[in-house]
């Protein structure tokens, strides 16, 4: 789905090239290598270092490893899109489904088990936590979108938005 959406977006904006950024444990490397998109490359980021995945780090890593092998350059002015957004593009364009839900990863040592849920936009974190069995113990902090780059929430009444990727 992500590859199909990438083809659609790259054609729509007349992209000179595509760089897929993945971590070293990415399991579908062969699919990306055989995606059929001209001037596409895979950039493997070491996500054990902090920070990782920001535009600046991606550009720096690109300049170190791929710059010489491609007929295009990457800069902060280019389009950077994450895989969940590309999945939403796929659902909207190819399946004709509006974006009314979001895949959200719930994890942490205060819930009984980690899970990836398809959540309706606007649903509160509190409602979702109740649906997955509540808290095993009271959390000292709840963070949206990762411990390294995310933001803590002041209340569990905060809704899931189109920008929410994870809750921990």
Feature-to-residue mapping (PLM):
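Residue-level preference for well-ordered alpha-helical positions
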Residues: 10, 129-130
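Hydrophobic alpha-helical positions that pack around
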Residues: 16, 21-125, 132-136
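Generic structural signal for individual residues within well-ordered alpha-helical segments
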Residues: 3, 126-129
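A general structural signal for short secondary-structure junctions and capping/turn motifs
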Residues: 10-11, 96, 159
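Histidine-anchored nucleotide/phosphate-binding helix
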Residues: 1-13
